[in-house]
Amino acid sequence: MVDSLQKPELEELRPGIKAPAKETILTPRFYTTDFEAMAKMDLSPNEDELRAILEEFRADYNRKHFVRTPEFDGSAADMDPETKKVFVEFLEQSCTSEFSGFLLYKELSRRIKNRNPLLAECFELMARDEARHAGFLNKSMSDFDLQLDLGFLTANKKYTYFKPAYIFYATYLSEKIGYWRYITIFRHLEQHPEYRIYPIFKFFENWCQDENRHGDFFDALMKAQPSTVRGFVAKLWCRFFLLAVFATMYIRDVQRKEFYEALGLDAREYDRHVIAKTNETSARVFPVVLDVDHPKFYDRLETCIANNNQLAAIEATSAPKPVKVLRKLPYYLSNGLQLLKLYLVKPLESDVYQPAVR
């Protein structure tokens, strides 16, 4: 008999504190940016909309939402060990992602407070939301006798520098794709409550509205900086970030498909729905979006998944490191080629793709 209270077999820094996941191209990253450029940013082209969104943030609709209920007590004990393992990985990635947003938004609000108070307050209130989400997720991990040391993460994670425009693209997509991920899971579990393996999923409906509001903020901010969404160069960058976000999510989720199976979802179908909806939403602000219905779009991503499986198999061998590198090279090159071909597929002009919204 398997002990249902047994902790998932995951690496720990010390008893009860989970070691951070090994950094790969698929794991959440921590970001920093040009704070001086953010402080100087002129918001006048879209200031009215930004002030309206600030009022939404001040209202703090979810102030009393993230309160644990008695339903959480003992809920982890009902999971089988394999489901526990993939679920803890989901909690960790989600917590790390939310905490990454908190750190970026908090530092932005602190650095620009005296020179760009409107922008600073928006970032401060978004940091409040992200901290709330990260804390709720980390508390859920404690039900499995594990937690993340967020202070350790702050001090030891590598920070990736993105200039402000890249931060806007990446965080807009992160927030909007987060909305579609959470609401899709929530609606599925409403129809199939037998797959609700843990009470946290009941919180996803209100939770995703925070993500949606944050995405709306970056939508408004990009419209206040017209160069980010107008012109040839902006189109190239929008395509790049759409592809990077969609490909990363699809490859990562298919590789951890057991988590979605535990929820009664097919990882591929779920991701295709989320990608289609996020692509459609992005047409409200991006000048172009991807042709995700192109017959080769998912075929090429599946090739990347097959390549990654080969890379993992090579890494698991006892061959010397130089030999591993040589064996891996064709698969790395193939991944690069697949993504380049996807990037070169003719995009959809947003004003044609979604004229009613535009």
Swiss-Prot record:
Enzyme class: oxidoreductase
Pathways per UniProt: Porphyrin-containing compound metabolism; chlorophyll biosynthesis (light-independent)
Cofactor(s) this protein requires: Fe cation
Lineage: Bacteria, Bacillati, Cyanobacteriota, Cyanophyceae, Synechococcales
Entry EC no(s): 1.14.13.81
Biological process (GO), any one: photosynthesis
A Pfam family it matches: Rubrerythrin
Name of this chain's protein: Magnesium-protoporphyrin IX monomethyl ester [oxidative] cyclase
Catalytic reaction equation(s): Mg-protoporphyrin IX 13-monomethyl ester + 3 NADPH + 3 O2 + 2 H(+) = 3,8-divinyl protochlorophyllide a + 3 NADP(+) + 5 H2O
This protein's UniProt keywords: Chlorophyll biosynthesis, Iron, Metal-binding, NADP, Oxidoreductase, Photosynthesis
A GO term, aspect molecular function: iron ion binding
Transmembrane parts of this sequence: none
UniProt similarity note: Belongs to the AcsF family.
Presence of the UniProt keyword Metal-binding in the record: yes
Naturally occurring in which organism (per UniProt): Synechococcus elongatus (strain ATCC 33912 / PCC 7942 / FACHB-805)
Function: Catalyzes the formation of the isocyclic ring in chlorophyll biosynthesis. Mediates the cyclase reaction, which results in the formation of divinylprotochlorophyllide (Pchlide) characteristic of all chlorophylls from magnesium-protoporphyrin IX 13-monomethyl ester (MgPMME).
